[in-house]
C-alpha cells in the first residue's frame, strides 16, 4: 500500500524500542517507552504558507505524544505535522 501524506504532514516509521537496558536487563513489551525517533518515509507537498523541510530518509526526533498511530500491512507508522518534529538527526 502506498501512503501519501497531505499538506504539511509526514509519515514516520518509528525506530524499534530498546530491548535491553545498558546494564543488560531485558525490558518487557509492557514497560517499553514509546520511541521518540524514527525515519521519514513520505512527506506531503506542504502548504502555501509552509514549505516542506523534511524529506524521505531523514531521521528525526519528535515529541512523546506527537502524531497519530496507524498500522498498514502489519507495520506501525506515525503520521504527524512537520511542526511536531523537533529535530533532524545526522
From Swiss-Prot:
It comes from Bacteroides fragilis (strain ATCC 25285 / DSM 2151 / CCUG 4856 / JCM 11019 / LMG 10263 / NCTC 9343 / Onslow / VPI 2553 / EN-2). Belongs to the GroES chaperonin family. The gene is groES. NCBIfam families: PRK00364.2-2, PRK00364.2-4. Together with the chaperonin GroEL, plays an essential role in assisting protein folding. The GroEL-GroES system forms a nano-cage that allows encapsulation of the non-native substrate proteins and provides a physical environment optimized to promote and accelerate protein folding. GroES binds to the apical surface of the GroEL ring, thereby capping the opening of the GroEL channel. Disulfide bonds: none annotated. It comes from the Bacteria. The keyword Chaperone applies. Keywords: Chaperone, Cytoplasm. This is Co-chaperonin GroES. GO terms for molecular function: ATP binding; metal ion binding; protein folding chaperone; protein-folding chaperone binding; unfolded protein binding. It is found in: Cytoplasm. GO terms for cellular component: cytoplasm. InterPro entries: Chaperonin_GroES, Chaperonin_GroES_sf, GroES-like_sf. GO terms for biological process: chaperone cofactor-dependent protein refolding. CDD domains: cpn10. Its main location: cytoplasm. Pfam families: Cpn10. Heptamer of 7 subunits arranged in a ring. Interacts with the chaperonin GroEL.
Amino acid at each position: 500500500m502506498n501512503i501519501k501524506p497531505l499538506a504539511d504532514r509526514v509519515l514516520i516509521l518509528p525506530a524499534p524500542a530498546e530491548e535491553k537496558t545498558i546494564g543488560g536487563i531485558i525490558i518487557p513489551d509492557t514497560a517499553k517507552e514509546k520511541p521518540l525517533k524514527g525515519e521519514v518515509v513520505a512527506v506531503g507537498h506542504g502548504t502555501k504558507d509552509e514549505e516542506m523541510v523534511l524529506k524521505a530518509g531523514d531521521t528525526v526526533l519528535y515529541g512523546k505524544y506527537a502524531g497519530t498511530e496507524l498500522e498498514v500491512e502489519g507495520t506501525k507508522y506515525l503520521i504527524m505535522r512537520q511542526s511536531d518534529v523537533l529535530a533532524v538527526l545526522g
